Amino acid sequence: IELINEDFSVDIGKDILLPINYLGTGIISIVYLIIYMLNSGNGILLVDELENGIYYKKFADLIRTLDSLSHELNVQLFITTHSNDFIRNLDGFSELSLYRLNPKFDGGVMQWDRTKIMQYIDDKSADIR
């Protein structure tokens, strides 16, 4: 990524740099997220529906990258989602806890540990929403 005339451009392996806005809103969101992570070292970052604009087959790669970067920068991520596809890729995070808001549950919040989440991921018919 390079700053050219006050705009970010990205090297995509071709002979020219493309302005970042040519790459779509999903990529732009990820670039901003990485910038926010760089500025949030030793802190927390709240991310709403990270999966929006990202091709679902790339969720696992994205999660592994964010997990690695979050450890490197010591940033704790809190991510909201309504996407089963995204949840099914959460095993890429080395440390993981999932919270589900449910007014019928005592206290209104259900907490799932890694074991419970992996059981959910294995049940292809499950829907957490």
Model features per residue range: what roles?
Residues 2-3, 100:
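Structural signal for conserved beta-strand scaffold positions within catalytic alpha/beta enzyme cores
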Residues 4-39, 44-57:
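Conserved ABC ATPase signature
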Residues 60, 64-129:
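C-terminal lobe/lid and adjacent interdomain/linker elements of RecA-like ASCE P-loop ATPase modules
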Residues 1-2, 79:
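A generic structural-conservation signal
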